[in-house]
């Protein structure tokens, strides 16, 4: 995580993440922790379930080969926990090796 944080230089941006490249460089150990800003949740009107469905739908659309949604839920998503800072949420995704996951999320990485 520190290598990734240094790589991104603590910048919160819209970013294309190529997980396969991170994995090959040894920067990712099958898990990617993201601080996701609450504006991606459409404010408070959408709860955790709404965000969960949105996240699964999004990743289903961009994963290649495209997995079934139930498989994505079981193998690529491990949970959402609220954080008491900056109205952010932490999302941990389990990513198998050699899968290229391209995501556009506004986030910053903790050390």
From Swiss-Prot:
Superkingdom to which the source organism belongs: Eukaryota
Miscellaneous notes: Partially overlaps ABF1.
UniProt-recorded name of the protein: Putative uncharacterized protein YKL111C
């Amino acid at each position: 995580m520190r290598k990734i944080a240094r790589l991104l230089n603590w910048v919160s941006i819209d970013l294309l993440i190529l997980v396969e490249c991170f994995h090959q460089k040894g920067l990712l150990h099958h898990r990617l922790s993201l601080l996701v800003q609450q504006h991606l949740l459409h404010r408070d009107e959408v709860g955790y379930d709404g965000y969960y469905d949105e996240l699964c739908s999004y990743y289903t659309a961009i994963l290649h080969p495209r997995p079934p949604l139930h498989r994505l839920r079981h193998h690529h998503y491990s949970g959402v926990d609220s954080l008491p800072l900056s109205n952010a949420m932490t999302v941990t995704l389990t990513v198998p090796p050699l899968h290229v996951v391209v995501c556009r999320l506004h986030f910053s990485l903790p050390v």
